[in-house]
Amino acid sequence: MSVACTIRRHIIEKLHVLNIDNFVVTNESILAKLIVDYPNNPDHGDLYTNAALILSKYIKKNPMDIAKILVDEFSSIKEISDINVVKPGFINFNISLDVWYEIIISINRLKEKFGHVNFGNGKRVNIEFVSANPTGPMHIGHARGAIFGDVLANLLERVGYEVVREYYINDAGAQIDVLVESVYLRYKEVLGENIVIGSGLYPGLYLKDIGKLLYQEYDSGLLGMDYSQRRRIIRDVSLMYLMKLIKEDLALLGIKHDIFTSESQLQKDNIVQKCVELLQEKQLIYYGTLDQPKGTEGINWKPRTQMLFKSTDFGDDVDRALQKADGSWTYFANDIAYHFYKISRGFQHMILELGSDHIGYVKRLKAAVKALSDGNATIDIKLHSIVNFLDNGAQVKMSKRSGEFLTIKDVIEKVGKDVVRFIMLTRKSDVVLDFDFAKVVEQSKNNPVFYVQYAHARVHSLIRNAPKILEIELVDFSVLSSKEEILLIKLLAKWQDIVEISAKTAEPHRITFYLIEIAEAFHALWGYGNKSTDMRFIVDNNINLTSARIYLAKSVGYVIASGLTIFSIVPLTEMK
């Protein structure tokens, strides 16, 4: 249990028995609002609580007066060394140094398992991510969402969830017809025809490889086949080839999905029809007309009666059409059928990773999941923004004249998988990210992945060069008394809290920020050793101080390794 969690537990125990003006806290919903957290300004103490402010709403007493009563009660908590009140009623604590020293002992005993917490309790979570159209190899633009989804899955597994990683193959839309036509042209090209890639077709040279496969299997036989037979063959061969490419690209990033679900297979299994029938049973479908969509003024638009889902009953802005004019299902109908399929497989919690251009899908999909599950299932939709690729500040062209894009393979060959994974997590997922090819391979503190890996490598260099140290139970850690040492220990103590909040908010970038902060504090402490021999990790003729500092350094190594493992990044023990 983290220091913050320990103090919060003690405070709750005190509040359960405390009587203020005949008010005793018995309602757990009140305690759910209780915060014990780290202040933004360390001058305000190690931790603070809003307990007095929360209670003032129920006791009808000035929060400063309540805080003074609480201070008398909380002062007996053994981990607290001093306590004070600041307006409008926050209570600040400093924690005993012995508590912080115990953190070093705990980390060295648990090693990379320090900070592990289980609040998932084996609950199943479905995370769908990537789901790129199977019309070509994955370009680098797909990497951010892919890495985010994979790391989020790792993170949720770390806190006790059973995670299923899923990829939805969009193999039933109009893009597949375009793919088939584009591949057929390349097949003709292999046969010796001069071809013209028309507007709207896929021009990528990679399609020629599929044309060659078809030629090897069928020679010129496809030319004489009827359209439907030829389409089926080209479709099946193309999808098999391209999904193989996509899986290989994902493997280069260190990503492997558990399940690949086919849109066309769901259609064959009548999942859309079953989903619509369920919504009809719930009386959530009607026939009506919609207002003209915003932004289409001046376009020849006519209202028409269509099948609509009552998504506004569940928080959406407008009701949604399920059928097109020709009777085929809309994209949205297929999307909600897919989530109906997930729910039917027993998933009560789903996470969907999408590009930020899909923001309009958030409310409608949440409405659909709520309707289909009677409110028993939830979906959390995480959006990721674009990545600007630069080379020493200059924009990198993402596409070539051939119609091919900068691929994941291109980038990994240039900078390596682990660098790509780390850099993609250095910003909140919905914020635009700059990826500079020159900067991500720099060996400087301006390169966060180098800075963190260098800290881990420094720890291992120190361990390799250290003399034999004392057993940990024999070390007097009170010799770690400098401001910089105590700051580093307090940072290390936050690791469990960082893991927990990152998982609960589905924001793995918080771990990146934390690892950079740890590396910065460790490098700063190392730098003080260059200025003063008394601050070095290895101090001649002082085995106790050397041992204490080595265990502190090892703690840094264990925590950094634990964080990088969540990212599926190999912690380096020496820099190349």
Swiss-Prot record:
**Which Gene3D superfamilies does the record associate with it?**
Arginyl tRNA synthetase N-terminal domain, HUPs, Isoleucyl-tRNA Synthetase, Domain 1
> What PANTHER family does its record include?
ARGININE--TRNA LIGASE, CYTOPLASMIC, ARGINYL-TRNA SYNTHETASE
> Which Pfam families does this chain map to?
Arg_tRNA_synt_N, DALR_1, tRNA-synt_1d
GO terms, biological process:
arginyl-tRNA aminoacylation
Name of the protein in its database record: Arginine--tRNA ligase
Q: Name one GO molecular function term.
A: arginine-tRNA ligase activity
Record's subcellular location: Cytoplasm
Origin organism is Ehrlichia ruminantium (strain Welgevonden)
Which reactions fall under this protein's catalytic activity?
A: tRNA(Arg) + L-arginine + ATP = L-arginyl-tRNA(Arg) + AMP + diphosphate
**Assembly and partners?**
Monomer.
**Can the keyword Ligase be found in this entry's annotation?**
yes
Keywords, sorted A to Z: Aminoacyl-tRNA synthetase, ATP-binding, Cytoplasm, Ligase, Nucleotide-binding, Protein biosynthesis
**In which family does this protein belong, per the annotation?**
Belongs to the class-I aminoacyl-tRNA synthetase family.
